[in-house]
Amino acid sequence: MLIGALAAAVTAIRLTLHVLAATVWVGGQIVVAGLLPTIRSLGPDAGKAVARALARLQWPAYAVLLLTGVWNVAATRAGQPHTWQVVLGVKIGVVLLAGLAAYVHQRTASRRALAVWGAIAGVASLAALVLGVVLAG
């Protein structure tokens, strides 16, 4: 009985950390995209300042997503059907693409590249979120 309650508590912690990190990672991108016109109106350096501040929140959240994602796979993968495993593989690829695109977006200087890599990061992050919901059933 105690072991079952402890296992349920650990599962709740694992899933809460994962969802909270996804909220910060994906939600931050959505919020900044919506605020971009206002941010740009604040001056030429406002966008960079907001990006630096957001990065201080988002990169730790991305790390938590990766760690809890591995934890989730270890806790739930056994006995899952082949289609679940395929969706998981696609999700892992999309998560890595989202991180890579966000990293390139953060490092680029051209406005066009910022738009392209930001869009790729945003779409990949949303796709990873949807695939996570699919995997959760």
Model-predicted regions and their roles:
Residues M1-G137:
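Polytopic transmembrane helical bundles with strong interfacial aromatic enrichment
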